[in-house]
Amino acid sequence: MKTGIKKVKLHVKKNDMVVVISGNDKGKTGKILRVFPVKGRVIVEGVNIRKRHMKPTQGNPQGSIIEREFAIHASNVKKS
């Protein structure tokens, strides 16, 4: 019986240097920090930076807004 989850073989892997070939960050270069083969997405250093609102916790009672990289589709990058 199939589970419905299909792993996509990607042309890039962790620590590869890549160039973004489409999207808002077109032309930017960076190192791949993380790969998600099931979703076909990658996280590239310094690309697709977004703000993330963190809830207040015991360790950080104020809460905060942090900027971090979010995943982009692997078809939007190529090795450099």
From Swiss-Prot:
InterPro entries noted in UniProt: KOW, Rib_uL2_dom2, Ribosomal_uL24, Ribosomal_uL24_CS, Ribosomal_uL24_KOW, Translation_prot_SH3-like_sf
Keywords: Ribonucleoprotein, Ribosomal protein, RNA-binding, rRNA-binding
Domain of life: Bacteria
Record-level GO cellular component terms: ribonucleoprotein complex; ribosome
Gene3D superfamilies: 2.30.30.30
Any one GO molecular-function label of the UniProt entry: structural constituent of ribosome
Keyword Ligase in record: no
Name by which UniProt lists this protein: Large ribosomal subunit protein uL24
Organism annotation: Chlorobium phaeobacteroides (strain DSM 266 / SMG 266 / 2430)
Gene that produces this protein: rplX
